Amino acid sequence: MRLLGRKSMLLVRTTLRPSEVHGLGLFADEFIPKGFVIWRFDGHVDCRYDESQLAALPEEDQEQLRTFCYLNPGTRLYVYCGDNARYMNHSEQPNTENVGFDEGLFEGEGITIAARDIQPGEEILCDYRSFDADARDGEI
């Protein structure tokens, strides 16, 4: 298992595979115990955009970013996950929990932890509404 002190967004080994939920999904390559931090914001890997920065981009780039970004409910900035965390699919019964996004407790963002033990080969799922203001407005 990777050490928590390491600079990264995803703190567990994962792989991308076709998902029964939607398109590609993020799957655990190792056992992840309940409570383990799976993801955290890293300003060296992730990018933040405000609405005017997105609007200034070509339409194709805007579409790509709006697909993969989440809108932080506290800062109202769009966050693009620079690694495969952006392939976490939505579930109303996720195996992860998102902590601190409304308060911006971790570098202005939150963290994602395992809500229960996650087995190798299991898809890592999150509830977009717990950290994405657009999803709270019904845009999932």
What do these predicted ranges mean?
Residues P18-F27:
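Short aromatic-glycine motifs in intrinsically disordered, low-complexity regions
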Residues D42-G43, L77:
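Intrinsically disordered, low-complexity proline/glycine-rich segments
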Residues D46-Q62, A135-I140:
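Short, compositionally biased
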Residues G25, F31, R116-Q119:
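Residue-level "contact hotspot" at macromolecular interaction interfaces
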Residues P33-K34, I38, D46-R48:
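Catalytic strand-loop segment that frames the active site of acyl-thioester-processing enzymes
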Residues R2-S19, E60-D134:
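Catalytic core of the SET domain in histone-lysine N-methyltransferases
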